[in-house]
Swiss-Prot record:
The gene is ZAR1. Interacts with YBX2. Ovary and testis. Pfam families: Zn_ribbon_3CxxC (PF13695). GO terms for biological process: membraneless organelle assembly; mRNA stabilization; negative regulation of translation; oocyte maturation; translation. GO terms for molecular function: molecular condensate scaffold activity; mRNA 3'-UTR binding; RNA sequestering activity; zinc ion binding. A zinc finger (3CxxC-type) spans 326-409. Disordered region at the N-terminus undergoes liquid-liquid phase separation (LLPS) for the formation of MARDO (mitochondria-associated ribonucleoprotein domain), a membraneless compartment that stores maternal mRNAs in oocytes. The 3CxxC-type mediates binding to the 3'-UTR of mRNAs. It comes from Homo sapiens (Human). This is Zygote arrest protein 1.
Length: 424
């Protein structure tokens, strides 16, 4: 029967590594419970707690909280647990009831973002989602180094979750999804599934004050959002020293061009610089700037030199732009082809951009030279509720058709072009 189990389980992936190749402190087992109880510790073998004298000498220097087994003991227990798991899957009467495996990782958490019940042939265990503390370190590696200090210091704020030890021992570290079902080898990237912002974002947000810090976001914060945060964070606290420094820099820029007559205006600009910096992007600009550009584009004040904040303000403020769909006639003189098609008319400030179309024969690009609105020819409205007229083909004169009301009565309508095509 053992040979049969080995043949069937050849398809599974079993890496050649010791069962505890990472830091995974296990709680001490209850005396009244055995291996089949609620503990992960095995009798005589398996992962022993770090406080036991047997595992103290076998623990590695890099992994002080984990014991190691010899090759013979590991192979014997591993093969026996594999066979028992196979017998439990085939039929309940073929062998004894399966116990928990001697390896430290015997299950796969399907979705690391939500609470999920781990399905495993060796048993069922629920891993609760760990709520992230704002005071705790940002990554699971930092939490593993500090031990269970954050959990033991705040027992009243958060109760014990399911799957956590009840005797106050340090909680086992939560790992992302493993490579295989029975594989103790976890992914190398421990920060693959982090709740809240990453370590880089946590270091950036630690410098901000408590009043500016909001609730942690539900999704992961990417590197681009971190860069945006670094750009926005230093601009909030603006002091008079920063305004004076900016005024001095602006004076050094404008002094060669405008001459020595600028100190009064530079002082005014130095006072106005912190106000413009403290103004949020959603607030409307001042009245002086509003009357400068009527078409929505920011017009520079006459005689004013370049400002260090002008490119940032230009990027933050959206320009006046809209897209309007039109119908136009396209005509290729080389191929003597004329067609009607919809195009997009982009208006940005005072610039009108036509999106070109290509001739189907010579592949040349053309702009529409006749513009008409998308209106119904019957009710003269852009959005109409007129009944759609289906095409009716006369058997005697197939080139005369009743088409849509949009092109009815036009000089070059659908029926005219259809008739012209039949005549040719």
């Amino acid at each position: 029967m053992a040979a049969l189990g080995d043949e069937v389980l050849d398809g599974y992936v079993f890496p050649a590594c010791p069962p505890c190749s990472y830091r995974y402190p296990y709680p001490a087992a209850t005396k009244g419970k055995g291996a089949a109880g609620g503990s992960w510790q095995q009798r005589g073998r398996g992962c022993l707690p770090a406080s036991s004298p047997c595992s103290a000498g076998a623990a590695s220097l890099s992994f002080p909280g984990c014991g190691r087994l010899t090759a013979a003991e590991y192979f014997d227990s591993y093969q026996r647990e594999r066979l028992m798991a196979l017998l439990a899957q085939v039929g309940p009467g073929l062998g004894p009831r399966a116990r928990r495996a001697g390896s430290c990782d015997v299950a796969v958490q399907v979705s690391p973002r939500i609470d999920a019940a781990v399905q495993c042939s060796l048993g069922r265990r629920t891993l609760q989602r760990r709520a992230r503390d704002p005071e705790s370190p940002a990554g699971p590696g930092a939490e593993g180094t500090t031990g269970g200090g954050s959990f033991s210091q705040q027992p009243s704020r958060r109760g014990l979750e399911q799957g956590s030890p009840q005797n106050g021992a340090p909680r086992p570290m939560r790992f992302p999804r493993t490579v295989a079902v029975y594989s103790p080898l976890a992914l190398r990237r421990l920060t693959a599934f982090l709740e809240g912002p990453g370590p880089a974002a946590g270091e950036q947000r630690s410098g901000a004050s408590d009043g500016e810090r909001g609730p942690p976001p539900a999704r992961l914060q990417g590197p681009e959002e971190g860069e945006v945060w670094t750009k926005k964070a230093p601009r909030r606290p603006q002091s008079d020293d920063d305004g004076e420094a900016q005024a001095a820099v602006r004076a050094s820029w404008e002094q060669p061009a405008d001459g020595p007559e600028l100190p009064p205006r530079e002082a005014q600009e130095g006072e106005a610089a912190p106000r413009s910096a403290l103004r949020s992007p959603g607030q409307p600009p001042s009245a002086g700037r509003a009357r400068d550009g009527g078409d929505g584009r920011e017009a520079a004040v006459a005689g004013e030199g370049p400002s260090p904040r002008s490119p940032e303000l230009g990027k933050e403020r959206l320009r006046f732009q809209f897209l309007e769909q039109k119908y136009g006639y396209y005509h290729c003189k080389d191929c003597n082809i004329r067609w009607e098609s919809a195009y997009v008319w982009c208006v940005q400030g005072t610039n009108k951009v036509y999106f070109k179309q290509f001739c189907r024969t010579c592949q040349k690009s053309y702009n529409p030279y006749r513009v008409e609105d998308i209106t119904c020819q019957s009710c003269k409205q852009t959005r109409c509720s007129c009944p759609v007229k289906l095409r009716h083909v006369d058997p005697k004169r197939p080139h005369r058709q009743d088409l849509c009301g949009r092109c009815k009565g036009k000089r070059l309508s659908c029926d005219s072009t259809f008739s012209f095509k039949y005549i040719i």
